[in-house]
Structures are given as C-alpha cells and as structure tokens.
C-alpha cells in the first residue's frame, strides 16, 4: 500500500529536515512537531541561503501555508 504524505513526514520526526518556503527561503532543523495543516516545529533551526547558514535560531514554528516542500536531510 502506498504511503500517505503525512506518513512520510511522521517518519521524519526527530530527524533533520529541509523546509522550502514559497518565498524562496530554506530552513534546516530537527523536526519536532507538525499538524495536518503542515505547520511545522523545528529545533536548532538554521536559515539557509545559497547553501550556507546565514542565521541560527533555536526552536521555530513555520506556518503550513508558507511551506512549499519538506524533505529529510542526511548530514555528513
């Protein structure tokens, strides 16, 4: 049986993810929460521009209607 999108996101809990926003911003951090509206909570969040960290945050909440994509990240 095919997985549903929220099942894939659930498997990413407590793992590093990359969140792409509609305005072109990218955040990387540990996914510690989400809901059915794709509001996400990241711990140790970082703002990424051109592949480089430009600002570090602690815990942040990103409103779901700003999210374009959410992807697991494998850190080296």
From Swiss-Prot:
Keywords of this entry: Ribonucleoprotein
One matching Pfam family: LSM
Family according to the record: Belongs to the snRNP Sm proteins family.
MF terms (GO), sorted A to Z: RNA binding
GO CC aspect terms: ribonucleoprotein complex; Sm-like protein family complex
Membrane-spanning intervals of the chain: none
Protein's organism: Thermococcus kodakarensis (strain ATCC BAA-918 / JCM 12380 / KOD1)
GO BP terms in the entry: mRNA splicing, via spliceosome
InterPro entries: Lsm6/sSmF, LSM_dom_sf, Sm, Sm_dom_euk/arc, snRNP_Sm-like_arc
Taxonomic placement: Archaea, Methanobacteriati, Methanobacteriota, Thermococci, Thermococcales
Domain Sm as annotated: residue spans: 4-76
Keyword Hydrolase in record: no
Name recorded for this polypeptide: Putative snRNP Sm-like protein
PANTHER family in the record: SMALL NUCLEAR RIBONUCLEOPROTEIN F (PTHR11021:SF0), SMALL NUCLEAR RIBONUCLEOPROTEIN F SNRNP-F (PTHR11021)
């Amino acid at each position: 049986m095919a997985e549903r999108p929220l099942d894939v996101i659930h498997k990413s809990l407590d793992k590093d993810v990359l969140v792409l926003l509609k305005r072109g911003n990218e955040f990387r951090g540990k996914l510690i929460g989400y809901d059915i509206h794709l509001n996400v909570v990241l711990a140790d969040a970082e703002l990424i521009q051109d592949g480089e960290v430009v600002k570090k945050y602690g815990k942040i909440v990103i409103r779901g209607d700003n999210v374009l994509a959410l992807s697991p990240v494998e850190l080296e």
